[in-house]
């Protein structure tokens, strides 16, 4: 059971591991965050102590898992990985915590989805490095305190507002990851191409970067798909022409918007004259979960100025209407 809980998230992304930078100096973008993190890591190494508990937050695909792996690598300690939805019982978390060694890193992805009973176990573990476990049942039940080695909890979330204040306050380091610039994504695409042994010219890398929604995960995924088109058409190195063709075939427009984005924008434009319209109405019309819209569709549309969230609902901007037409 423990093996199913640990490394669940990382195991699902094993094929991506080779594309991830393993050291902070190799990590592209997020310069202010990276600079601060380097100071925190160096200080903890000099003090021979665990890094303070760290909360990483931001939209999906910006490198939260990679940062957790880098922290463990820079500290030269073990990394144990799991995810909030997997930890359904307090005993699940207790089993993981009691197997940690000094200064180890425990990474919990989607930490905002922790069961409240599991979350409460974390409070004493984070503050006092101890667990209070009930042994037995009924009148004979007794509480036993188990002391843990000092460790670092790294939590990752795309929904900072859903994390309870007691849990949020126990993280000594808060790091926000922002969308990447085209220049940063171009470097990431070029590095990924070298790792994958894919030849591409600068214009192709820029084209992929421009359509990647400011997100490295998407950039690397699109690179692989453009590579497939290049192999099929026997084009080497990849150039802007095959890149443009491939991305158009995939339904990715010049700003990186896909069919889901266009459906979202057109629904508001054509049915509500640009808004406002409530998120639940949008979710029902698009047959999507509200969380999916709020986490996967809206962040980038808001970032590029196409959507505004108001008290009355979602409103699309003049720039969005212009793009649709």
UniProtKB/Swiss-Prot annotation:
Molecular function via GO: ATP binding; ATP hydrolysis activity; four-way junction DNA binding; four-way junction helicase activity
Pfam families to which the protein is assigned, alphabetical: AAA_lid_4 (PF17864), RuvB_C (PF05491), RuvB_N (PF05496)
Region spans: Large ATPase domain (RuvB-L): 1-180
Lineage: Bacteria, Pseudomonadati, Pseudomonadota, Alphaproteobacteria, Rickettsiales
Assembly, per entry: Homohexamer. Forms an RuvA(8)-RuvB(12)-Holliday junction (HJ) complex. HJ DNA is sandwiched between 2 RuvA tetramers; dsDNA enters through RuvA and exits via RuvB. An RuvB hexamer assembles on each DNA strand where it exits the tetramer. Each RuvB hexamer is contacted by two RuvA subunits (via domain III) on 2 adjacent RuvB subunits; this complex drives branch migration. In the full resolvosome a probable DNA-RuvA(4)-RuvB(12)-RuvC(2) complex forms which resolves the HJ.
Positions annotated to bind Mg(2+): 65
Region named Head domain (RuvB-H): 254-325
Entry's Gene Ontology BP terms: DNA recombination; DNA repair
Database matches in NCBIfam families: PRK00080.1, ruvB
Reaction equation(s) it catalyzes: ATP + H2O = ADP + phosphate + H(+)
Segments traversing the membrane: none
Protein purpose: The RuvA-RuvB-RuvC complex processes Holliday junction (HJ) DNA during genetic recombination and DNA repair, while the RuvA-RuvB complex plays an important role in the rescue of blocked DNA replication forks via replication fork reversal (RFR). RuvA specifically binds to HJ cruciform DNA, conferring on it an open structure. The RuvB hexamer acts as an ATP-dependent pump, pulling dsDNA into and through the RuvAB complex. RuvB forms 2 homohexamers on either side of HJ DNA bound by 1 or 2 RuvA tetramers; 4 subunits per hexamer contact DNA at a time.
Designated name of the protein: Holliday junction branch migration complex subunit RuvB
EC numbers, comma separated: 3.6.4.-
Localisation per UniProt entry: Cytoplasm
Main location per the UniProt record: cytoplasm
Organism: Orientia tsutsugamushi (strain Ikeda) (Rickettsia tsutsugamushi)
